[in-house]
Amino acid sequence: MGSTSGIGLIPNNRTARNLLQLLNHPTIEKRLINKDYEAVGMIPVGTANMVMKTKKISKVAQLRGQRIGVLANNPPQQALVRSVGAQPVYVDLSNAIAQFQQNKIDIMPAPVYGLLPYNLQKDFGPDTQVINFPLAYFGVNIIIKPQAYPANFGRKIRAWFVQNSQLLTNRAIQWENHLPAYYWVDVSFYEKQSYDIMVAKIRNQYVRSGYYDAYFVELMKRLRCIDDPRYFECPMSR
């Protein structure tokens, strides 16, 4: 399940919902269980988008030289930032907002949920904007030690997530819709496609290295293609 947060894998809440609905599929279920741990669900939070304090950036090439917040334990994020000529700066969930407010980073990837307590223009700057292009998906994976619970407990919890997948993802959609429209900035289809290609190249490197689970990456690509057949890795787009 850790691969669900992989760069460029889950582009929206619909794909996250479709993944949740498959948690009790026999082929998938056996991959969620090992001797010591069992993945029983994921709480969707929403897509992580670039938050920046300037309106002068609208193209990938303009990211060169920018300081972008990344998680220290996430090498693919760091590689992606370096690939556009930007500088990765280590942050964590407890200090990312403070680093952004104190101008220690120029760009902060974040889910909208993390921005809702703030007035973006007042707390971050008058030109603050959110790029309407998902870098990754943010969710809270629920992992248990199966030996500490009754038999089939994990399956029952996964069944709950399957049954409530629409409710859970609707909540994430509501959070994203809560952000006023004037903060969102769209990028061109050409820019999105260029960035998708770059993200996929780096992601596939980490699949080959074993950092990402190849099975789940392929599964999520198939789910993405169902939702967006135009995505360049989908058969219909070729």
Swiss-Prot record:
Keywords: Antibiotic resistance, Transport. SUPFAM superfamilies: Periplasmic binding protein-like II (SSF53850). InterPro entries: AdeT1/2 (IPR045758), TRAP_DctP_sf (IPR038404). One of its GO terms (biological process) is response to antibiotic. Disruption phenotype: Deletion of the gene results in increased susceptibility to different antibiotics, dyes, detergents and disinfectants. Coiled coil: none annotated. The keyword Disulfide bond does not apply. Belongs to the bacterial solute-binding protein 7 family. Mediates antimicrobial resistance via active efflux. Contributes to resistance to antibiotics such as chloramphenicol, erythromycin and novobiocin. May be part of a tripartite ATP-independent periplasmic (TRAP) transport system. This is Probable solute-binding protein AdeT2. It comes from Acinetobacter baumannii. The lineage of its organism: Bacteria, Pseudomonadati, Pseudomonadota, Gammaproteobacteria, Moraxellales.
